[in-house]
Amino acid sequence: MRAVCRRFGKSTVAFYGKEKKRLRKAVDTDCVVRRVNAVRMELPFLGGRKTFHLVKQALANDGVKIGRDKFFEILRKQGLLIERRRAFVPKTTKFDPSLPVSLNLVKDIVVDSPNQVHVSDITYIKVGSNYAYLSLVTDRFCRDVIGWHLSGSLKSSGPIAALKMAAKAVPSGTSVIEHSDRGCQYASKAYRKLVSRLGFRSSMTEERHVYENAAAERVNGILKLEFALDRCFRTFSEAKRAIREAIESYNTKRPHEMLGMMTPTQARANPALARPKALRAFESAKKASQRSAARRAAARKAA
């Protein structure tokens, strides 16, 4: 080896140093791939930043010193970056002008604790050649799904069943704001009667616009695109089983940047730890909503 190094004008120290570095890089890459694949076994479509948060301590324990940029470079080279998907979304909001509409009670409030505001929405689930409809109730602060129901129709019975489930997670005597879009299911007499009987308050978007119920829409997207609920299920029971498992994993395993990389379950158990990051996120979202409203108002005025 000395003769070869002399022939090419290299020292053996430089040669072995370079070889050691190459081997170290290969070992580090192998560790990263192994740790990422372990996470993806449970959260197959989790994005890179959240995956890095989940594996960085384990990598440190493995002796791998790596920053986020290098981590993303390895994911890219190994074909492990997640490509965001979009799917066709059938309309699930049906507005009935004959039904009463609640005021938007959440527009200007700061949500800083669990059981303060729930956001509700309905999203489609493909079952065979038909659609089923998933009603969800999510806590606005800690982002956990606390109520859900899969129905074969868009009747109000779906949101009512989801709300009944959600109510079981709320301490007795707590007056929660139940926020939703203006869909006829949420404006129905039966749904509003249940909200009142539970001691909750009804709130609705002022406009039929997704920005005014963005938190609920976001959860829909996460469950579909990160937990594969956008696929076509063979049977209704298969869909229900997949939804139950997806919600359990979402609540207990998926970190949220808006919660300081805590899971929804962790945020509910330790709201004080999640609050600083959550409040900054709420303020940022509020400003974005105000800018969006101003643009829409300007567009209407120009028209």
Question: Residue spans of the language-model regions?
Answer:
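K/E-rich alpha-helical interaction surfaces of small helical-bundle regulatory domains
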Residues: 2-22, 44, 242-261
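Mobile genetic element proteins and their domesticated derivatives, centered on retroelements
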Residues: 4-8, 15, 36, 51, ...
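Basic, flexible linker segments flanking DNA-binding modules
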Residues: 9-114, 209, 265-277, 285
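Short small-residue beta-strand/loop micro-motif enriched in glycine and branched aliphatics
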Residues: 17, 144-148, 202-205, 229-230
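Mobile-element integrase/transposase regions
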Residues: 68-136, 158-162, 169-175, 289-303
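RNase H-like two-metal-ion nuclease catalytic core shared by retroviral integrases
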Residues: 94, 180-182, 188-195, 202-224, ...
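A short acidic/small-residue loop/turn micro-motif
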Residues: 139-140, 150-155
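C-terminal domain-tail junction helix/linker
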Residues: 196-198, 222-303
